């Protein structure tokens, strides 16, 4: 349902690329921003980036997994608190505030990015959100769920509801198809059926049968998938499930803007560079690995990716920088909108940064 006008990033077709290395070296710095749009929100004038995404930060409960690389546990040095530690309470008040925020944004086309902790962990919250989305359907040109799939595996209402809400895709995270290796990295609660490989596979098939495309998300790391051989085995497993799109994401560049904790130490110890995979698949001389075809490259305001075709699967190799994100956030233009559990709308994942205001 994505419209032609909605363009959150810049895609360059392979036919226009003579030297992919210049984009690999420049990465997100090759992104050219469009002119911002001025909007009045809660009585103040703000500049918004065209094509931005809106995230109702999904934390109706604490997360039911404890991924070793969890970005929601990263504490930026300017953060006074983490949204992950303040769960949503008082649904009537919360959804009334979200309704007011969406009403004020009417006419500004956005993408809906349903992420945060685990959006499917509390089905009643998700179903109510989807009902409100139906009221504001015209606001969102693209709708994406980011999930570990846990609630989709246990509540039969959720997948049909996503299909009725016309979600463009569900991005389901899986670090490895080997159940034990995946559990070592994603650390699901022992009572979560999705931790089992056969449950995950059946959930992927069922989501696709209901008409919601699935993109599998694999976070590159040295405990799981890190080499081209690992990548190709993962793709073979994905193809067997009928999946048409897989993204391999490098752990984001953190710089020195985060407080040291368990997650930053794990990331530093287990980072696997996506550039190494890019150079193996398409080298500096333009030779492409057998079975792979470059489709193009995409630049965003804090990320860069290359898109390939391998067999029936579209493959994305992606890198990003939370430092670039922080710098863009401080540019005076809201790059993203996040509706936090406190009913505050912000232009940042950090709830005390770029605060538009509270919609109570």
Please describe what each predicted stretch is.
Residues 93-101:
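Internal amphipathic alpha-helical repeat/solenoid segments
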Residues 15, 73, 77, 323-360:
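Flexible mid-to-C-terminal extensions adjoining Fe-S/redox cofactors in radical SAM and related proteins
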Residues 73-93, 105-122, 136-154, 164-200, ...:
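Core AdoMet radical
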Residues 1-26:
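Intrinsically disordered, low-structural-confidence terminal and linker regions
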Residues 102-106, 160-166, 204-211, 238-240:
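Acidic (Asp/Glu)-rich catalytic clusters
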Residues 83, 180-197, 205-328:
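Radical SAM enzyme [4Fe-4S]-AdoMet core and its adjacent flexible, acidic
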Residues 23-94:
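Canonical Radical SAM [4Fe-4S] cluster-binding loop centered on the CxxxCxxC motif
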Residues 124-131, 153-162, 226-234:
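Distinct, well-ordered alpha-helical segments
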């Amino acid at each position: 349902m994505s419209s032609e006008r909605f363009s959150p990033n810049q895609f360059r077709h392979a036919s226009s690329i003579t030297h992919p290395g210049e984009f690999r070296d420049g990465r997100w710095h090759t992104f050219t921003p469009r002119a911002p749009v001025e909007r009045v929100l809660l009585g103040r004038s703000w500049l918004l980036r065209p094509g931005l995404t809106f995230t109702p930060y999904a934390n109706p409960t604490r997360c039911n997994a404890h991924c070793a690389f969890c970005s929601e546990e990263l504490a930026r040095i300017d953060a006074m608190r983490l949204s992950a530690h303040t769960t949503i309470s008082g649904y009537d008040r919360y959804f009334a505030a979200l309704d007011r925020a969406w009403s004020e944004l009417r006419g500004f086309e956005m993408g809906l990015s349903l992420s945060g902790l685990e959006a499917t962990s509390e089905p009643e919250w998700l179903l109510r959100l989807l009902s409100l989305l139906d009221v504001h359907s015209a606001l969102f040109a693209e709708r994406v769920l980011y999930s570990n799939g846990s609630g989709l595996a246990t509540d039969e209402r959720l997948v049909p509801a996503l299909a009725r809400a016309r979600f463009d895709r569900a991005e389901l995270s899986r670090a490895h198809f080997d159940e034990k290796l995946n559990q070592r990295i994603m650390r699901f609660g022992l009572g979560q059926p999705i931790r089992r490989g056969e449950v995950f596979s059946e959930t992927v098939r069922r989501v696709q049968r209901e008409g919601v495309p699935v993109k599998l998300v694999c976070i590159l790391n040295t405990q799981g998938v890190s080499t081209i051989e690992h990548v190709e085995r993962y793709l073979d497993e994905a193809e067997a499930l009928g999946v048409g799109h897989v993204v391999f994401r490098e752990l984001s560049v953190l710089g020195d803007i985060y407080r040291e904790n368990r997650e930053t130490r794990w990331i530093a110890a287990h980072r696997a560079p996506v550039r190494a995979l890019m150079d193996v698949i398409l080298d500096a001389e333009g030779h492409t690995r057998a079975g792979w075809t470059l489709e193009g490259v995409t630049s965003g305001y804090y990320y860069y990716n290359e898109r390939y075709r391998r067999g029936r699967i579209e493959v994305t190799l992606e890198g990003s920088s939370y430092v670039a994100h922080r710098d863009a956030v401080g540019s005076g233009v809201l790059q993203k909108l996040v509706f936090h559990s406190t009913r505050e709308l912000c232009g940042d994942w950090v709830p005390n940064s770029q605060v538009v205001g509270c919609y109570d």
